[in-house]
């Protein structure tokens, strides 16, 4: 019998070999791997094979250590002409110290070297090692304020300023151009006092365009001349004064004789001579407040000098200078906990705000890096001054919680200008809330507005956009003090209206909160999106409208017993609640 043999073979062609990367892709992968490998050399956790060390001034801004960065001379010399020239001209080490690593003092190595911190130095060195500029570490370039976007806060500025000093000193032109553009963006966004480090680095590193931009911005700010004189080198301050208008408020000069007496007091404080300050006060009509002596001591003097100064005479520790800062604000900019405690003990308010809405705690947080928080410090170890300042301010705020929410209306002075965006935003938010309350709960709204005396103020009479636009209108017959008083009274009345509404009509207030927080309640949004989205939004709007109706019925029933006991009137149950002999237990839950 013949046996047939059947062979099985695939009719499909063999699978093609995997595609080979193009030569350019291979180069990119290899260079990327090389960059990562070289970057490991700057990692303290990696094998320490450095043959030289760069010594930072004062620990490079890192308390408790990190004052030395190990480097490799061969890499730096190959990548940087600056380091090639430096290492080739450096004398050979002495035989007795041949085994030691040569050290480069950063303060004497480059202009502005004493300002460079470890994080900025490592970032610039990493560019020399890898050819890539890595992003700034968040813990070094972000502040502690959760409400800050960190695009122009002080830690972000300081990191780029320090990096500019390093890049300019090491003659890395492409990095200098990049950092200059970033600093230019900061000038347009940052606070005036935070621009001063940029002004100094622009002068030191010979960046004329950036320097002129900084001078124009600072010259037009409300920073007083004494502050600038203390913070800037003499040549920069002299150049800046040329651009300032002499009769502006920031000049602080009333007359030559007054200016002379004030300067004598400040010179005595510079010499720590509080006794001389006392003599000068007795010999002239100038007071501590006139000379802003508490501000000066809080910003520039030793803590003991301020403590002695506060004993001389009664001074207003909450007085604001021409820039809108209290002595506590100045102390927070300095982050000196002893001075902060001394001022608080004398009655300084932690809730006073600057013209742009910052309080003392916010000032401290926006000056403090995340890495400076130092919350996990070991026992028996000193904590950073920044951490102590924040802790003191937080405890003081907790001690007075009843005035935290109503800070703006609790301020005693009405002379400080209030026409700033955050103030108007708060006022507009309150007006919007009261306007919706009058639409949804007209009777309840009228009652609480009468109690809060809000309906007696002309500004609250209408609900049109024309009335809201009056917020920023200028009445030529109205002085700034009158305008500020009117705005404060308006804010107080609206705040009181909302508080009374929450107390006596909690269900209505709860639904109003829900209504204002729901994006779908915007009538414009009801018609946006797909058909399915519009249907969902309409359903949600109907649900909220039903909640409004139920809440109205519930609060109305709660006050029915009181209403029935009153005589007939246009609004009987409201008038009953105002009479002292009636019970209110059911309405104040």
From Swiss-Prot:
Residues 13-22 have a biased composition (Pro residues). The lineage of its organism: Eukaryota, Viridiplantae, Streptophyta, Embryophyta, Tracheophyta. The keyword Zinc-finger applies. The BTB/POZ domain mediates the interaction with some component of ubiquitin ligase complexes. This is BTB/POZ domain and ankyrin repeat-containing protein NPR3. It comes from the Eukaryota. Residues 1-25, 555-589 are annotated as: Disordered. Interacts with TGA2.1, TGA2.2, TGA2.3, LG2, TGAL1, TGAL4, NRR, RH1, RH2 and RH3. GO terms for biological process: defense response to bacterium; defense response to fungus; regulation of jasmonic acid mediated signaling pathway; regulation of salicylic acid mediated signaling pathway; systemic acquired resistance, salicylic acid mediated signaling pathway. Belongs to the plant 'ANKYRIN-BTB/POZ' family. 'NPR1-like' subfamily. GO terms for cellular component: nucleus. Residues 580-589 have a biased composition (Basic residues). Pathway: Protein modification; protein ubiquitination. Salicylate binds at residue 433. The gene is NPR3. Residues 382-521 are annotated as: Salicylic acid-binding core (SBC). ANK repeats lie at residues 260-290, 292-319, 323-352. A zinc finger (C2HC NPR-type) spans 140-154. It is found in: Nucleus. Residues 558-571 have a biased composition (Low complexity). The keyword Zinc applies. It comes from Oryza sativa subsp. japonica (Rice).
